[in-house]
């Protein structure tokens, strides 16, 4: 019985660790879909505009959040310390502005609902009908 409990706990942790992150936007956003490369370019500060030329405002979770770790690992294969070091170099050199920090998935959704140029990421399990999914990150 004890072995079964350990096995089930491991399975649950594994399932939670592999949860899919989604990139969302305002339902009236002109952007319907972004490729993985386009999301990388936006979140790594390489571009500040959507492929259609419209301004993009990226939202980011707190520096130490599990959502942020899952998102960047799935998107770039990099760990949070690597992402933080990357941004520290860009900011120090004055070459880019990092995504706007927010405190929670609820704040991502609330900000997106007020700004048609904003995009953010949340866990797929937190998806609500009031936003549009424009990319998947596994």
Question: What would you call each of these model-derived segments?
Answer:
Residues 1-4:
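Positively charged n-region of N-terminal signal peptides that target proteins for export
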Residues 14-16:
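N-terminal signal peptide c-region/cleavage motif recognized by signal peptidases
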Residues 20-138:
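Exported/periplasmic ABC-transporter solute-binding proteins
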